[in-house]
Regions:
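An acidic, low-aromatic, low-complexity terminal/linker signal
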Residues: 1-138
């Protein structure tokens, strides 16, 4: 879905995904809960006839579940999963090469990369998948 070199900004604002990581954006996704999954996992959703796990960005960021929202389907190293977020703000360009990123904010997870002031912080999908909360059943 995504073109290399661009970002897709998500709600809550200030976070974005690289467009090349995106497969599809699904409004009002049907997510089936899974007993025993970790707190950040909302359940399973259908993507092109197959099931993918869906994690909740709100829970990952501040512990609060996302109400309603959209699911962005993501591909990383051949694996696919969904990320539930409050919404999608839209596409935007990557910051220019001279734009210096700020320092990570206190409490930011490792997978939320620093960005220049006024730009969204990019979610590093590989680092997100390595987060211990994303490792499945508890």
């Amino acid at each position: 879905m995504g073109a290399p070199g661009g970002l897709m900004e998500l709600e809550p604002g200030g976070r974005a995904l690289r467009q090349e990581d995106l497969i599809q954006i699904i409004a009002d996704p049907a997510i089936a809960p899974v007993t025993g999954a970790g707190d950040c996992w909302r359940g399973l959703a259908n993507l092109r006839g197959g099931l993918i796990g869906v994690a909740d960005l709100g829970v990952l960021l501040d512990g609060r579940p996302t109400e309603g929202g959209v699911m962005v389907a993501i591909s990383c190293g051949g694996d696919e999963f969904g990320l539930l977020c409050a919404g999608v703000r839209g596409a935007r360009e990557l910051p220019g090469p001279d734009a210096l990123p700020d320092e990570p904010l206190a409490g930011d997870p490792d997978w939320l990369l620093p960005a220049p002031p006024g730009e969204p912080r990019v979610i590093d999908v590989e680092l997100l998948l390595a987060d211990e909360r994303m490792r499945g059943a508890s």
